[in-house]
C-alpha cells in the first residue's frame, strides 16, 4: 500500500541522499518536508527451523530515495520516505537490494511523529534468510517533535515484530516541515529523545557527587596531616 502511494505521488516530490543524509522536497513548492540524518543499523531476529538466529546489518550504499510530502493513509495526511539500499555483506551472488519505508504523521498534539515503518530484506553472504519486518505496535518510540522543532537522539530505536529493531544512530529528524534548504539550519531547535534527556540529567548529578567526594577526601587528608604534625610536635617537646 505504501509503495502505491509513493508511485502515485512521485511526480509531486523529489528525494535524495548523500551518505547518511536523506531528504524529500515538494516539487510544487520547492520546499523540503522531510530531512533525516543518521546511520542505520538493523538488528534482525530470524526464527528458522525451531532455532533463533540474530544478525546485525548496516548500510553499504544507498541505491535510491523516494518520498511524498502529500500522502494520505486512512484519511490521515502522511509523508513518506522510501530508501532502497545495498546492505553490508552483499555480493553479486545475492544482488537484490533491501528496502526501508518510513511513514510520518501529524496531529493537533505533535508537528510530526513516525507512525509506521517496514523493512524488506534479502539474502546476503552474511544473512542467509530474507523477510519483511513490520512495526511492533507495542514497542516504545519517541521520534516526534512539536511546533517547528526537529528530533535529536544518539540512538533512536524502532521496534519490529519478533524482537528485531532498527537503530538510527546520531539521528536528526524533521517532517511536515517547509524548509527552503535540504539541510538543517544552524539555528534549528531540537527536542532531545527521552534517553538522552535522562542522561543529560544524570551526568551533572554524577559529576557533582564525584566532586563532593573528592572534596571530602582532600579535607580528611588535610585533617589527618594536621593531626600527625601536632603529634610530632608534642613528641619533639
UniProtKB/Swiss-Prot annotation:
Family, as annotated: Belongs to the LAMP family.
Gene Ontology cellular component annotations, sorted alphabetically: gut granule membrane; late endosome membrane; lysosomal membrane; phagocytic vesicle; plasma membrane
Subcellular location: Membrane
Keyword annotations of the record: Glycoprotein, Membrane, Signal, Transmembrane, Transmembrane helix
InterPro entries the UniProt entry points to: Lamp2-like_TM (IPR048524), Lysosome-assoc_membr_glycop (IPR002000)
Leader peptide range in chain numbering: 1-17
Protein name: LAMP family protein lmp-1
Organism of derivation: Caenorhabditis elegans
GN (gene name): lmp-1
Topology Cytoplasmic: residue spans: 226-237
Coiled-coil residues: none
Domain of life: Eukaryota
Transmembrane segments: 205-225
GO BP annotations, alphabetical order: establishment of protein localization to organelle
Taxonomic placement: Eukaryota, Metazoa, Ecdysozoa, Nematoda, Chromadorea
Regions of this protein lying in the Extracellular compartment: 18-204
Recorded topology in the membrane: Single-pass type I membrane protein
Residues bearing attached sugar chains per UniProt: 27, 50, 60, 75, 180
Keyword Transferase: no
Amino acid at each position: 500500500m505504501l509503495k502505491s502511494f509513493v508511485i502515485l505521488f512521485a511526480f509531486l516530490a523529489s528525494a535524495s541522499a548523500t551518505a547518511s543524509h536523506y531528504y524529500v522536497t515538494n516539487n510544487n513548492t520547492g520546499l523540503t518536508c522531510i530531512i533525516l540524518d543518521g546511520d542505520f543499523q538493523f538488528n534482525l531476529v530470524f526464527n528458522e527451523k525451531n532455532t533463533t538466529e540474530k544478525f546485525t546489518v548496516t548500510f553499504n550504499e544507498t541505491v535510491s530515495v523516494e518520498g511524498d510530502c502529500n500522502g494520505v493513509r486512512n484519511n490521515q495526511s502522511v509523508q513518506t520516505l522510501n530508501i532502497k539500499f545495498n546492505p553490508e555483506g552483499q555480493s553479486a551472488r545475492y544482488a537484490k537490494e533491501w528496502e526501508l519505508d518510513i511513514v510520518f504523521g501529524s496531529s493537533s498534539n505533535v508537528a510530526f511523529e513516525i507512525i509506521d515503518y517496514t523493512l524488506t530484506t534479502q539474502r546476503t553472504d552474511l544473512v542467509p534468510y530474507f523477510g519483511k519486518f513490520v512495526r511492533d505496535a507495542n514497542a516504545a518510540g519517541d521520534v516526534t517533535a512539536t511546533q517547528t522543532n526537529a528530533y535529536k537522539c544518539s540512538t533512536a530505536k524502532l521496534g519490529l515484530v519478533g524482537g528485531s529493531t532498527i537503530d538510527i544512530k546520531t539521528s536528526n529528524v524533521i517532517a511536515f516541515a517547509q524548509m527552503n534548504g535540504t539541510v538543517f539550519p544552524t539555528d534549528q531547535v531540537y527536542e532531545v529523545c527521552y534517553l538522552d534527556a535522562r542522561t543529560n540529567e544524570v551526568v551533572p548529578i554524577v559529576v557533582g557527587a564525584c566532586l563532593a567526594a573528592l572534596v571530602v577526601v582532600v579535607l580528611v587528608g588535610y585533617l589527618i596531616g594536621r593531626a600527625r604534625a601536632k603529634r610530632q610536635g608534642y613528641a619533639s617537646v
